[in-house]
């Protein structure tokens, strides 16, 4: 992770520049990771992209699964499902929003269930 930028009183960043730096820091700090939680606020967009929040008992994060990845899923997501999502952490610069770009999804515990049989 890059060292934090030391505050300098005479430097003023534009919002775009700040958001770009935040994006670069976040995206370089986190590799492709699995994140588990419950689906909420699920939207299937006309474009084919899937938008939802992934939450646990004390936090939530916005997620997007692009059409090209969503087409490979093979089952329909629903609010309330417990899942594990393989994600890339990203920061959407135009709105200054942290989100997860979802690459793949599996039902939570699916691996354990199949291992028993």
Task: Outline where the language-model segments fall.
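Acidic, two-metal ion nucleic-acid-processing modules in DNA metabolism proteins
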Residues: 1-117
